[in-house]
Amino acid sequence: MKHIAAVIVVTAVLLFTQTYTSARGAEYKIPQTVDMTPVAEEPAELYALSAVLMDGESGRVLYEKDGERPLANASTTKVLTCIVALENSSGDDYVQVSQNAASQPEVKLGLQKGEQYYLEDLLYSLMLKSHNDTAVAIAEHCGGSVEGFARMLNRKAKQIGCEDTYFITPNGLDA
């Protein structure tokens, strides 16, 4: 189970932070002159609703477009759902599927009410295929309800330093 947690955390970091750093011990010589000629023209319009470009070393924001704009957490919610589930349960727990979980919209595994699965299997489904029904089944198992699990997500988000972040569902869909 710890191996799964490590793989998920590493995957999440690589996929969602987009921070790149140099290899340890590598020595670089800074050139005396740097060609500052743009490689390409700046796009006339950035198509993303919001964007932030940050220096990975200093944390300084280099570019921002509506960086404070509230947006849906989307599938990044599922990463935190997985982390909270791993911290509050065991992979060999049996999870019974409710009607609420079974009735989630696409993308879904196709869980049916009354079926039982190992939590570990549902976590794989959640992280590899982003299944909405497995997120709800996991949430109901670990938090007693979607609402209870949302409180757990919000506590964890605050604990790890997330600001202006609020979870309502374990799958990132609108409530």
Positions of the model-derived regions?
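Active-site-adjacent loops and short helices of periplasmic peptidoglycan-processing enzymes
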Residues: 23-175
